[in-house]
A protein has these predicted regions:
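A structural signal for long, well-ordered, hydrophobic/aromatic- and basic-residue-enriched core segments
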Residues: 1-251
């Protein structure tokens, strides 16, 4: 008499476990994927923004790769999800995914190396994480980022024309030359997105993930004929002016 096997059958080339494959099929593969937005500024436009990009080593972040496979990003996020048992076993989150048989490290340290971020900003006065948690300085944020003479309201709205509080603090820190560790922000956001995969939301940082996969040796040729992620509208001087974000005031 034939006996039934208790071993789950799954595609172990594409997925870490049967659990990850199931989440991919049920939820992840239907998620919208977005890329980082490219900065497209001429040499005489917003020099303070271009200066901050160069100072922080964010050139690769500000000029994202295009023509990225949506399936690649879906598989990356599906395999970044871990169970509660795995979290307890390893004492926290794992900064590791798996794409087409290849482990992909998305730890802050590896993101900084692959993206060529500078380790810190010379002469930085404070840190974004400290500001976010303990010293938001919202009066300064409003005074220096918002247009004079307008009435402003802090909200948690998610409209594209609105800036959430945390993002406003991030922009303020960047423009003031304070320490912003982009690698930690990206790694943390990937973790939170993966662990909250059943919630509404989009899958981001596709260009960074593509570069991590390429560095790890993922066979990207296998994704050549798959559907690509739409390119985001670049940030231009005209777009900055239309959103009424002023330049950083001089002191």
């Amino acid at each position: 008499m034939a006996s039934s096997s208790s071993v789950s059958v799954f595609d172990n080339y594409r997925f870490r476990t049967a659990f990850n494959e199931e989440l991919y099929n049920i939820t992840v593969k239907n998620k919208k994927v977005i890329s980082e937005v490219c900065f497209n500024l001429n040499d005489d436009e917003y020099p303070e923004i271009r200066e901050q990009i160069a100072l922080r080593g964010w050139r690769r972040l500000a000029a994202p790769t295009t023509e990225i496979s949506k399936m690649l990003i879906h598989e990356f996020y599906a395999n970044a999800i871990i169970t509660e048992e795995e979290r307890e076993e390893h004492g926290g989150h794992l900064y590791m995914s798996f794409v087409r048989g290849v482990p992909v490290n998305f730890s802050p340290e590896n993101i900084r190396r692959v993206m060529q971020f500078k380790a810190e900003v010379e002469g930085a006065r404070t840190n974004f994480e400290t500001r976010k948690a303990h010293d938001q300085q919202l009066d300064n944020v409003l005074a220096e980022l918002c247009m004079p003479g307008a009435t402003w309201k802090l909200s948690t709205g998610q409209q594209r024309s609105e800036i959430p509080v945390i993002r406003a603090i991030l922009i303020h820190c960047i423009m003031k030359g304070e320490d912003v560790r982009a690698e930690e922000i990206i790694a943390d956001k990937i973790i939170r997105t993966a662990q909250g995969i059943k919630e509404k939301g989009k899958l981001g940082f596709s260009s960074t993930i593509y570069k991590l996969c390429n560095d790890a040796g993922v066979p990207l040729r296998e994704f050549r004929k798959t559907k690509k992620i739409p390119t985001e509208t670049p940030i231009t001087a005209r777009r900055l002016e239309s959103t009424r974000l002023p330049r950083n005031p001089q002191h």
